[in-house]
C-alpha cells in the first residue's frame, strides 16, 4: 500500500466570527457514498443552519476531490475548505462547515478566511496521522539474550509485541519497510550472529504527524 495522511479521528470544532457560528465536522471516510452520507446527515441534523458547506478527498493518491458552497457565493466556501485539506495532504476525509448566520455579512474575502480557517482549526485540534505499512520481524531468543533485548530495542526506539515465554522467548517487532535490512543487521551484530529472526506478515499502523 502507499502511505497517506488523514485525520487522527472524527471530530467537531466550533468558533464564532462576527456573530456567525462556524461548526466544522470532520470524518474519516473511504468511499464517495460514505462521504455523501456523512454530509447529508449533517445537513439533516442542521437543517436550520444558513449553510452546510462541504469538501472531501478520497483515495491513496487523492484522486477524488469534491466540494460544495451550499448557497454561499461561488468559490467562497467549498473550494477554500478543499484547499486546506490539500495543503495538509489529507485524504480519505470529509469536512462539513455549518454556518449559522449572525447578522453581519463577511464579504467574499471574509467568507473564504472563515471557511478555510474553520477547517484549519479543526485539523490542528483533531490531529493528523500517517497511515503506512510496517514489516514484522519475528525474533527467537534465549532467556539470557532476552535480558539484553530491552537495551537493543531502546537504542533503536522499538517496541516488542506478542512476546511468548516457552523453552525460548519468541517476540515481534515492527519497522518501516526501508528499515528492515539495517534493523536485521543491527540485531545480528548486537548478538554476534547468535540470534534467529525472520520477516513475517506486515501490519498497517497510524503514526501521529507532529
Residue ranges and their predicted role:
Residues 1-75, 180, 198-210:
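C-terminal regulatory domains involved in ligand/effector binding and gene-expression control
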Residues 24-25, 54, 92-95, 136, ...:
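Structural motif
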Residues 35-38, 115, 149-152, 183-186:
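Hydrophobic side chains in well-ordered alpha-helices
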Residues 77-125:
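Active-site beta-strand/loop microenvironment that shapes enzyme catalytic pockets
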Residues 127-143:
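Short glycine-/aliphatic-rich beta-strand segments at the starts of folded cytosolic domains
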Residues 140-158:
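Short amphipathic alpha-helix segments
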Residues 160-165, 191-207:
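Conserved short beta-strand edge segments in small beta-sheet-based binding/regulatory domains
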Residues 173-180:
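Terminal, non-globular segments
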